[in-house]
Amino acid sequence: MPDLIFVYGALRKGASNDWRMKDARWLGPAKVEGTLLKIDWYPGLVLGLGGWVKGEVYEIGAELLKELDEFEGIGLEDERNGEYHRVKREVLLDGSPTEVWIYEWLKGLEGFEVV
């Protein structure tokens, strides 16, 4: 069964790593409650905190989900050393609440610019 995933940075259409989504089915623009941080050349999403972050939702298969997890550093032996974890959250996809996977930033807000 396919999974739904919300992407908000380098995986979005036209971004530097959008090629990773070539085997995914684009479902449309979406937004999630959260704050986007400038980490380096890539962003990090902290869920909640009152703002809205725009992104896109894709339908993907298990193999692509595994590849994206590797790209985002998920599944490390000690995930506390990673930057992200993958969580299920509700986004608004074309205005409708939809449960999706999201990569959330784990390292906090301090020292990072809000974008």
Tell me what each language-model feature is.
Residues 1-115:
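Glycine-aromatic micro-motifs
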